[in-house]
Amino acid sequence: MRNPSTVVQENGSVSDFISQLGYFAFSSRFLNLNSEGCSGSSSHSLYLNGFENYRCVKRPPRSGASLSLSSRGSSSLRRFVNEFNNVIKFHCHKPPLGFASLGGVSDETNGIRDDGFGVSQDGALPLNKIEAENPKRVLILMSDTGGGHRASAEAIKAAFNEEFGNNYQVFITDLWTDHTPWPFNQLPRSYNFLVKHGTLWKMTYYVTAPKVIHQSNFAATSTFIAREVAKGLMKYRPDIIISVHPLMQHVPIRILRSKGLLNKIVFTTVVTDLSTCHPTWFHKLVTRCYCPSTEVAKRALTAGLQPSKLKVFGLPVRPSFVKPIRPKIELRKELGMDENLPAVLLMGGGEGMGPIEATAKALSKALYDENHGEPIGQVLVICGHNKKLAGRLRSIDWKVPVQVKGFVTKMEECMGACDCIITKAGPGTIAEAMIRGLPIILNDYIAGQEAGNVPYVVENGCGKFSKSPKEIANIVAKWFGPKADELLIMSQNALRLARPDAVFKIVHDLHELVKQRSFVPQYSG
């Protein structure tokens, strides 16, 4: 039986098999190439009729064409891959469908209609000649596939406001939900479904990892959503575009490149995964890629990004985490906690997911000293939007002090009131806990992007991993008792690894980048 505290390394042969499976599924089912090398489905063909100077040329049929493992089959496979890559390269350099209909602009009208909030409505691409007194416009691209992307976007927006005030206007948009047609606008809902069914998500993650798969997917997808995405991007007239999501690089960059705007708009990526991350995070044409760790920077280099485009600043978290922390006693009093007992923070994310109730009950038992008839610690539980869970926990008669909260906006105060934290391996929560010097017990992770966060925490001496509520409770009880020294050492390690000023370094570097293009005519018809 597998030890619940063991992190299983993703099997390389399994992921390779899945990648090959995904490749053949994509090439045979989506492309549906016939014997002439053309797609049998006109609606999904990568050889688009709209491009008159490029047509599918029929070739004489070849006898014995096969994808078998024989030498002839291997030759056919190599020939197919080469032809397939040529098609993808062609489509990555062609303007997306619908771009021509955006039309030109006149200098008199500037091609926009304003909605009263500084956001242009529809219209064509404006000719926006930046003046020194005009605020720069920042567009942050994210999607609600998990709470971390929005949290990073909000952190960057808050840092711009604190550091530069009215010199910057910052907009946050969910590009897929707000600016793509059905079914592409269902991305967050699809993600939530896949994550709840772990095997499906794991397969999706690894199938789309190979470059030949995700590059071709983006090229094909662009033909259907380019017009809407282009309008969605350009209505904000951005000076800077910041992507905080792995699916927000390839399609927007392709659109900007086809319009000749890549050397005029600062396009940057802020990676929000601490260690393991999907290859779609990286695109060679970004102006800058901000990495939260050296592990991610190494992956970016492997993906082909130039070292000069990389900055390792850390993960952006809310600026409120940088401010001096108030005394624990004061924070505990405000939160209704015991002012003297050591405290553990139990979290389940914004939706209050995971074994929170079972863990809280195990903590209540482990933190009660039967010999002396008194508690040795207390618990602060954050249930997020899960009101049913909060109601059940509040109805329990606990042996130790337990405070139950719903969705909280001042997480820095909750962390400041506690001595350690139990949470799943979300990168944002890990980064915030390290800033507060909280030893971390990870009780779960999402396969793929969060798998590497577990060894990142454990191997750096900042915490432990276990899926067993009973084992977790025993760890906390020892930290609050005979192993208090271990708790202190882990707290010091967390503070050493923390990067509280990451978000400010990011916005200041962005400020320097945009200053270099301050008087460049940005948008031309």
From Swiss-Prot:
EC number: 2.4.1.46
Stated role: Involved in the synthesis of the major structural component of photosynthetic membranes.
Name of the featured protein: Monogalactosyldiacylglycerol synthase, chloroplastic
Range annotated as the organelle transit peptide: 1-103
Annotated GO CC locations: chloroplast membrane
GO molecular function, one term: 1,2-diacylglycerol 3-beta-galactosyltransferase activity
Taxonomic classification: Eukaryota, Viridiplantae, Streptophyta, Embryophyta, Tracheophyta
GO term, biological process aspect, one: glycolipid biosynthetic process
SUPFAM superfamilies: UDP-Glycosyltransferase/glycogen phosphorylase
Alphabetical keyword list: Chloroplast, Glycosyltransferase, Membrane, Plastid, Transferase, Transit peptide
Keyword Chloroplast: yes
Subcellular location, principal: plastid
The family this protein is said to belong to: Belongs to the glycosyltransferase 28 family.
Subcellular location: Plastid, Chloroplast membrane
PANTHER family assigned: MONOGALACTOSYLDIACYLGLYCEROL SYNTHASE (PTHR43025), MONOGALACTOSYLDIACYLGLYCEROL SYNTHASE 1, CHLOROPLASTIC (PTHR43025:SF3)
Catalysis performed (reactions): a 1,2-diacyl-sn-glycerol + UDP-alpha-D-galactose = a 1,2-diacyl-3-O-(beta-D-galactosyl)-sn-glycerol + UDP + H(+)
Induction: By light and cytokinin.
